[in-house]
């Protein structure tokens, strides 16, 4: 989910950063028994713990035949040992609707793409502010951190791989959104109907389904005119999955007319460049410059005209915090000037947008979604409808982005007046669709990457992209 750059935003170093989610080390230390150190009896002892010398005094050794018989019995006992239970307990259905907890018996989910850092992290002297941030990261760390992320990523992969098979000209955008969101809720085993259930796991933000010159932040809304996918459309699919607030944000673009292939190739290559350059202590301005260089080395031929692919200037990649899709760091797709660096423990959504238009996105009419500003004061609220709506939002979404569809799914009615009051007071912020000039085409690819101490894990990587 792209982070729009404010009009008055100056790209530069941040004075301070918020705490970031922590990450586990790659190979945690094993217990002695698990590592095989306590596999058998100590030297000089029998398996019963008795000293061998006590048994040998004044006694003859057992015959060779007796020893052989004993060995055979032991071998038989070894063969009868029960096999370990496999990790997978069953297969996924089509469409995917079986909760992952029913497939992965031990609740451990697969690793994604592990990439070693190209240079050793030899910067051992840290400034005080960075040490403080690192302590905040450690305090936020728990044993389930990495497993939560891997579960969310596995849900994303399974859902999107099915959705890609049904995404064809003639399908309605509302049907695609429902398939994605129903799949996510089924696989996380959290339907989000009971109060607070959506905060445990589920959708991290509304499904983005943006066509052609619509760059980002469009989703079907109740009562709106149905939009049908056409053969000549360029469709961007952007959705997020969270488990306990650990958000995986990933997006891809589909086109059926091969004339758009070079556009998609350019944006995918630019995103992979950003992932390659990302790492601990990586300078964000260097990453941005590399992304733009790759993106704008491509051209696309449309209507017998050669059009350069341009990197969109006013939307960026971003770091991700717990229960917050947009953190305090941005990764532009164009050359910029900043001293900001990536840090150990950061989680980034590395995404790029390429356009055949002016490569600048403006707000369009309509509303994509909302999010609640946790720091805004509700002291000035007087309407009971606004107060009731705010409680519903906090109880069910917290700081996660939500849409009108999500409110109506909870059975909330007549919320428009209350929502206008919350938005006018600055308690709730709204997202508008972002568009390039009519007649242009925008493509997007995105992955979430975890900057672990000794490697980076592209957590959302799959066989598809």
From Swiss-Prot:
Binding site for a divalent metal cation 1: 238, 249, 446
Broad class of where this protein is predominantly found: cytoplasm
Presence of keyword tRNA processing: no
UniProt xrefs under PROSITE patterns: MAP_2 (PS01202)
Localization per Swiss-Prot or TrEMBL: Cytoplasm
Names of the cofactor(s): Co(2+); Zn(2+); Mn(2+); Fe(2+)
Positions of disulphide bridges: none
SUPFAM superfamilies per the UniProt record, alphabetical: Creatinase/aminopeptidase (SSF55920), Winged helix' DNA-binding domain (SSF46785)
GO function term, MF aspect, one: metalloaminopeptidase activity
Biased composition, class Basic and acidic residues, residue ranges: 1-13
Keywords (A to Z) from UniProt: Aminopeptidase, Cytoplasm, Hydrolase, Metal-binding, Protease
Family indicated by similarity: Belongs to the peptidase M24A family. Methionine aminopeptidase eukaryotic type 2 subfamily.
Record function comment: Cotranslationally removes the N-terminal methionine from nascent proteins. The N-terminal methionine is often cleaved when the second residue in the primary sequence is small and uncharged (Met-Ala-, Cys, Gly, Pro, Ser, Thr, or Val).
Name of the molecule in the record: Methionine aminopeptidase 2-2
Organism expressing this protein natively: Blastomyces gilchristii (strain SLH14081)
Biological classification of the source: Eukaryota, Fungi, Dikarya, Ascomycota, Pezizomycotina
